[in-house]
From Swiss-Prot:
Pfam families: ATP-grasp_IQCH. Residues 406-435 form the IQ domain. The lineage of its organism: Eukaryota, Metazoa, Chordata, Craniata, Vertebrata. Expressed in fetal and adult testis, in the spermatocytes and spermatids but not in somatic cells. GO terms for biological process: gene expression; lncRNA transcription; single fertilization. It comes from the Eukaryota. It comes from Mus musculus (Mouse). Residues 266-275 have a biased composition (Basic and acidic residues). GO terms for cellular component: nuclear speck. This is IQ domain-containing protein H. PROSITE patterns: IQ. Residues 276-286 have a biased composition (Basic residues).
Length: 1071
């Protein structure tokens, strides 16, 4: 190894030479005699030092050679040099010069001549070697040329200019780990290559590593144990050699033929001949080998052995079995276990005969070795006739015909019985467990529901107590609050029961029809917050902002005097409206679940007096008031629902002692209804129609009527009986007894066949109506016995301090039938105002005694009694809520700057307040015209037309403007629309103001006719009530004209009477 390094690196040879010299020195020192040395002790020390030095040199020699063999040093190359000279060797810089250990000075070195100079040279060699190494590695060093010349005798050429080159930052070094020997792929497959010898360092990596690198062939024998299968070369025959394949049977023909040749024991001779080669020897085979052509004598492949099983035992003497056993003798242990299980299976099922296919058996053998058990499908897979065996296995009781059949049958019976008992017990246990789970769940739900009910009840009670406390505070400070700066929060919520709200068509639109509440800002001290049930678009907000800005212009009659009042009213939509879209919640509930809207309202009312004006109060109104910490101008929700019901209003009217139609209330059973209705018909034979009203329904939804006398067969007989007994005796029970029996017998059938329902969509049949009527309770009352009937609505207010005021009164319009109000004319002209005010104040005082506070409305009906020809007024309904008529009245007063005098039933409009210049202009134009100071209004919130949804509001208003439908500020008359929402747009409200009632009705009808003509096509009319409203107005106009003619005739007759008495008066005066 030293010789190998000597040619390339002199340092290695020098170190080895030093090592040899030290060894020779050691031998010579050992031979010295005792006389030539000073003492033995010094010789021992010197020998120890030499051994230590030798060991150190040996270690460093190995280290140096390892570094030189494993690292490649690269010196920087300079392209500017024309003829670079590279030495055959270089001094490695990675040698740790400090690691050399030199021997210490000894006396044995003194006899030598150059001992001191040698030690001194060795001491100076270390820095000199380092400096020389640095100079030799840097060709650009100024001492490089001199060092090369001094060391090697090479004179480098002079280079005057050098090109700038980037300095090499570090030496590029290779891997310090030697690569392992890997056999090339060509050596692994080609046997002609000589195998590479295995070195000790390769062997130290292990056998597996050498196999992976190809140093050891994969088929090499690396253990001393004999392998189960010995690989050996397969003998191949020449293509030209013809071999005779014996095809004769090796057994007598009398025995059962078995296709097993004698050569089957030699596996090396059982080779199939390829098809291409077999064609060449087909002739000789036919001539020499095939003597008998039978299926049993045809040669088979080793995988086609078929042997029989008789009565569950394999025929072990059969030639096929013997051949199969000989072929697979190396794995016979597994095959034997396989066959044992097949034999057991066939014995268990009493299969007398079966045939096993050796090919299938061997293919299933690996799977069997893994599972160590067979299934029915596995057994059938190795049999030659699986279909027949499958039929036998499927026979009932086949298992019990085989071995241990009785024991198996007994086991099966016991297992079936135990399974049945266990199954029965389990089913019983499961049922009990399910029942216990249901009971436990029901109990948990009951407890949870009870706890929630208790919490909700406590919360409701707390809200009610806070409501009462705030109501007392409102009553005590009402005189101050109503004249000071305040904010009114309008929540037009319909707080009916969940069942009623569920059947209200488009509940959100119904709760947004009172936008006239915004007109409360007519009072300069009032700000309004209106809670809207629909998201209000910018178009609608702009419309109402312009409409409400007309307040100052209405007072002066000049359009330029408009003022923007958008800071005095706010329209807020609760965010829960967009969340709970199909829950049929009232507006108060939506607001309660809208924290953002609540927070905004709190910010708007902070530091100001505020109170809530609701609709039909709900318990959630109290919750909202509790959140906002403001009072409600209204009654407790329980009182509202009690006295707003039909039966509750009858109690109020009874206590007020006001005239009511004959009837009964608080009906909850069918028997009660038949008995009391029979009594009513008997007592009031002059009433032709009877009306059925449910307690909690509104708008005619829970109303039905029947003309009972017209269908009574005994009606004429009852009239004769009444005439026979006389008017006074007929009121006695004994006189009516026979009539009651006959009427009761006919009444049930008449009601089932002849009752007419007002809203057939809501209640299509009498049976459904009757069921809900008896569930909710209701009233039965008489319909006025007259051809001309007028319904009235009077709005009133009971203030917190107890003052009762009449706010509005109007005559109803009935476009959709006599029991559904579609609008009103205001002020009313049907009843004497003094009589009407007296009745309403009586009812108001009774309501105040019942702790009713806030807004409410009274429904009345007036007609001419045919028997006395006198006008009658009946009270029919009471609603403790803010009505649509009152909201439209507020809008009318806002647009006219008028005053409604309910005691005189007049709407008075004051004259304009103008400056002198504007007044002179007006007087010059209308010098001879006396301005009218009274107005009439026709208002409706129930106008609907499907085709309205086809046009936008902007187009609709432009269309109306083109046809002259609008409002005149100077005359303070015209038409204004109430727009509810911008999505469906099939419904709107309209207010028409005029000088006289007849003219305003005609204007209202004309507007409807024009709108209907503009938005309707001949082939697309749509559902609308425009036509019926026009017809009703025409009927009213006809009655008005007739009444006017009657009034004129009466006036003329009175004047004639006065003229008749006038001469007498003159004569008396003269006298």
């Amino acid at each position: 190894m030293a010789q190998a390094q000597e040619d390339s690196d002199p340092i290695g040879s020098i170190l080895i030479q030093v090592h040899e010299d030290l060894h020779q020195l050691k031998e010579k020192l050992v031979k010295f005699s005792a006389e030539e040395t000073r003492s033995t002790l010094d010789i021992q020390n010197l020998e120890t030092a030499i051994q230590r030095t030798e060991m150190g040199l040996k270690i460093h020699i190995d280290k140096y050679l390892g570094v030189v063999n494993q690292e490649v040093l690269m010196a920087p190359v300079k392209k500017s040099l024309e003829s670079p000279v590279t030495s055959k060797w270089s001094i490695p810089t990675v040698i740790d010069q400090k690691s050399f250990i030199f021997p210490m000075d000894s006396d044995f070195w003194r006899p030598q001549k150059h001992r001191g100079s040698l030690l001194h040279g060795l001491r100076r060699a270390k820095p000199k070697i380092q400096l020389t190494t640095k100079v030799m590695q840097d060709p650009e060093n100024k001492h490089h040329r001199a060092a090369v010349t001094a060391s090697y005798g090479i004179s480098l050429p002079h280079i005057n200019q050098r090109k700038a080159q980037d300095k090499v930052q570090r030496l590029i070094k290779g891997s310090t780990i030697s690569n392992l020997t890997v056999l090339p792929p060509s050596h692994r497959t080609d046997p002609h290559f000589i195998p590479i010898p295995v070195l000790q360092k390769d062997a130290s990596k292990g056998v597996l590593s050498m196999i992976e690198r190809g140093l050891i062939p994969p088929t090499a024998r690396i253990t001393f144990q004999n392998p189960p299968i010995k690989p050996q070369a397969l003998p191949l025959h020449s293509f030209d050699e013809h071999r005779k394949v014996p095809m004769e049977a090796s057994f007598p023909l009398a025995l059962k033929p078995r296709p097993v040749p004698e050569e089957v024991e030699e596996p090396s001779h059982q080779i199939e001949i390829p098809k291409g080669r077999a064609k060449r020897s087909r002739g000789p085979l036919r001539r020499k080998g095939m003597k008998i052509r039978t299926p049993s004598k045809t040669r088979k492949s080793p995988w086609d052995y078929i042997f029989s099983v008789y009565n569950g035992c394999v025929d072990r003497t059969a030639p096929d079995f013997l051949a199969f056993k000989s072929r697979f003798k190396l794995i016979w242990g597994s095959i034997f276990s396989f066959l044992e299980q097949i034999e057991k299976f066939l014995k268990d099922y009493a299969i007398s005969e079966a045939k096993i296919k050796g090919k299938s058996l061997v293919s299933l053998l690996p799977e069997f070795e893994l599972k160590n058990k067979l299934t029915r499908n596995d057994v059938l897979a190795v049999l030659e006739n699986p279909v027949h065996i499958q039929m036998l296995l499927n026979l009932p009781g086949q298992r019990y015909k085989g071995q241990d059949g009785k024991a198996e049958a007994a086991t099966k019976i016991q297992a079936t019985w135990k399974s049945y008992k266990a199954r029965s017990s389990f089913i019983s246990y499961r049922q009990k467990k399910w029942a216990s789970g249901v009971i436990a769940l029901a109990w948990l739900l009951h407890c949870h529901r009870t706890r929630l009910k208790r919490i909700v009840k406590e919360s409701r009670q707390r809200h009610l107590e806070n409501f009462r406390i705030r109501a007392q505070h409102l009553a005590a400070n009402w005189s101050r609050i109503r004249t000071s700066r305040r904010t009114i929060i309008h929540i037009p919520s319909l707080g009916y029961s969940q069942y009623v709200r569920k059947h209200i068509f488009d509940l959100d639109v119904e709760q947004n029809m009172q936008l006239g509440r915004l007109c409360d800002i007519i009072d300069a001290n009032v700000n309004v917050i209106y809670i809207c049930s629909h998201p209000m678009t910018d178009e609608l907000k702009l419309y109402y902002r312009k409409l409400l800005s007309l307040q100052a212009a209405v007072k002066t009659g000049y359009y330029g005097d408009r003022t923007d009042l958008q800071n005095r009213f706010r329209i807020i939509t609760p965010e829960a409206v967009n969340v709970f879209t199909k829950h049929h919640m009232c507006l108060a509930t939506h607001l309660m679940y809208s924290p953002k809207a609540i927070k905004r309202i709190k910010n708007l009312i902070r530091g100001e007096e505020a109170y809530i004006v609701g609709g039909i109060l709900h318990r959630d109104d109290l919750a909202v008031a509790d959140m906002l910490n403001v009072p409600i101008l209204g009654s407790e929700p329980e009182l509202v629902h009690l006295y707003s019901a039909k039966s509750g209003s009858k109690r109020i009217f009874d206590n007020a002692n006001v005239p009511m139609p004959p009837g009964i209330y608080d009906i909850y059973t069918y028997q009660q209804m038949i008995e009391q209705l029979s009594q009513l018909v008997t007592d009031n034979l002059g009433i032709r129609r009877w009306v059925f009203k449910m307690n909690t329904e509104f708008g005619g939804n829970g109303t039905a009527f029947c003309d009972i006398p017209s269908h009574l067969q005994c009606y004429n007989w009852v009239l004769k009986e009444r005439n026979r007994f006389g008017h006074e005796d007929w009121k006695k029970k004994w006189a009516q007894e026979s009539a009651l029996v006959k009427i009761s017998e006919e009444l049930a059938g008449i009601l089932a066949q002849h009752v007419q329902l007002v809203n057939e969509k809501r209640f299509p049949t009498w049976r459904k109506f009757l069921h809900m009527f008896l569930t909710q309770g209701g009233v039965i009352e008489a319909y006025p016995p007259a051809d001309s009937v007028t319904n009235l609505t009077v709005d009133m207010l009971i203030e917190p301090d107890g003052e009762v005021r009449v706010l509005s009164m109007g005559d109803q319009l009935h476009a959709d039938g006599p029991f559904i109000s579609s609008g009103t004319t205001m002020p009313q002209t049907s009843v004497d105002p003094q009589v009407l005010n007296s009745l309403c104040l009586q009812i108001g005082n009774i309501c105040k005694e019942k702790d009713v506070v806030g807004y409410f409305s009274i429904d009345l009906v007036t007609f001419i009694d045919p028997s006395t020809l006198e006008q009658q007024v009946w009270t029919t309904g009471l609603n403790l809520s803010y009505s649509d008529q009152l909201a439209m009245t507020q809008l009318t007063l806002y647009l006219t700057n008028g005053h409604l005098n309910c005691s005189l039933s007049t709407l008075e409009v004051p004259r304009f307040t103008e400056d002198s210049e504007r007044e002179r202009k007006r007087l010059s134009i209308q010098a001879e015209l006396a301005p009218e100071t009274s107005r009439y209004a026709v208002m409706s919130t129930q106008l609907k037309h499907d085709n309205l949804s086809l046009i936008f509001y902007y187009v609709f208003l432009q269309m109306c403007k083109a046809h002259g439908i609008g409002y005149d500020l100077e005359d303070r008359q015209g038409t204004v629309f109430i727009l509810y929402e911008s999505l469906k747009r099939y419904k709107l409200g309209m207010l028409t103001i005029g000088v006289d009632l007849q003219g305003v009705l005609m204007t209202f009808a004309r507007n409807l006719f024009i709108i209907h003509q503009e938005i309707s096509a001949p082939d697309m009319q749509g559902e609308t009530n425009f036509k019926t409203t026009i017809d009703d107005i025409e009927t009213i106009l006809g009655v008005t004209e007739e009444n006017k003619m009657i009034f004129v005739r009466e006036k003329q007759s009175k004047e004639e009477e006065d003229n008749l008495y006038e001469p007498v008066e003159i004569h008396s005066e003269i006298v």
